[in-house]
Amino acid sequence: MVLKVISANQAVAEAAKLAKPKVIPVYPITPQTSISEYLAKYVADGELDAEYIRVESEHSAMSACVGASGAGVRVFTATSSQGLALMHEIVYAAAGLRNPIVMANANRALSAPLSIWNDQQDSIAERDSGWMQIYAESGQEALDSVLLSYRVSEDRDVLLPSMVCLDGFILTHTVEPVDIPSQDEVDTFLPEFQPQAVLDPDEPMSLGTFTDPNYYMEARYEVERAMERSRKVIAKACQEFSEMFRREYGFVEDYRCEDAEIILVAMGSVCSTLREVIDDMRDEGKPVGLLKVRIHRPFPAEEIKKAVSNAHKIAVLDKNITFSVGGALHTELKALLPDKEVYGFIVGLGGRDITPEHIMEIVRKTENPERTVSWIGLKEESQ
């Protein structure tokens, strides 16, 4: 391994290079752009043997990914916000066609109003598309998640695309030390892609043909079954990754939850801030813990239940809004934990800072609740 001080975007690009994709269709968009720039440089400099396609839009990027994956090669792309929204039509097609594409998404708010700053609305809008979703907390986790995603997506029992999500600017442009595995290590962990069905003119077949009501429902059921099968594949891949690279990952990560009366639940980079504040609260005698949801799809229901089993109250921080019912993760936990008091907090939309004071406010509101869903960090005149 080599330790480099790099941004999370460069970490993602390094991971993609190590995975040796053969086709990389990308359209640049802030704050993802430097991922595509690094990959273009790797290809131009001869460090990566791949076809780098400069497409005219994100819709075309995902379309090219689907075509290349259908032709039997490993594929990578990256996008953000409006770019992911433009891909929406083909995002669903990729899952239905069982293309094991890996895509990095630099989480950014959706327009309108136009914003280039972070929240997680873009990827949450695709949570039901059939893609697996991982939310990274650090540059190291972003790099590792790309490698793990290929390992899981390409498994014959899964064959579903993966989206590695990293918070725009907060993570994408933050520079920190990242351990980069050697090519030999990655080649051992991630063997060459062995496609199951390939578009080959010498052996013609059809993929994604018109389907009438006699077959469509079964096709969607197969995606659901693959998503369920991915749980065991993910667990095995994480175990083997830990043995090889000495970094442990799972569906969730709990911190000081054993005796916690209140557990804060979140995804992404905010978890680093939450740990610091929780330590301060513990020093003051407040029994608070953190549950980081790392893998959002497949949804880690049993892991969440186990982690929060001893807590009385759950506070869910969502960087998204599902209008009229709160945030997406909050609605899922509220349905999952009917015997718990589950409160939702909308935070950080459009890049609004989530400060230690905001986190302490969330704990206070959970201790003495006035409503099920609260917005944190709003300007006073808006409240």
Curated annotation (Swiss-Prot):
Q: Which UniProt keywords apply?
A: Oxidoreductase
What EC number(s) would the UniProt record show?
1.2.7.1
The annotated dependence of activity on temperature is: Optimum temperature is 80 degrees Celsius.
Give the EC class as a word.
Answer: oxidoreductase
Any one Gene Ontology molecular-function term assigned to this protein's record: pyruvate synthase activity
GO process annotations (BP): response to oxidative stress
Question: In terms of pH, how does activity behave?
Answer: Optimum pH is 10.0.
Its catalytic activity?
A: 2 oxidized [2Fe-2S]-[ferredoxin] + pyruvate + CoA = 2 reduced [2Fe-2S]-[ferredoxin] + acetyl-CoA + CO2 + H(+)
- Membrane-spanning parts: none
Assembly mode:
Heterotetramer of one alpha, one beta, one delta and one gamma chain.
The protein's name? Pyruvate synthase subunit PorA
**Gene this chain is encoded by:** porA
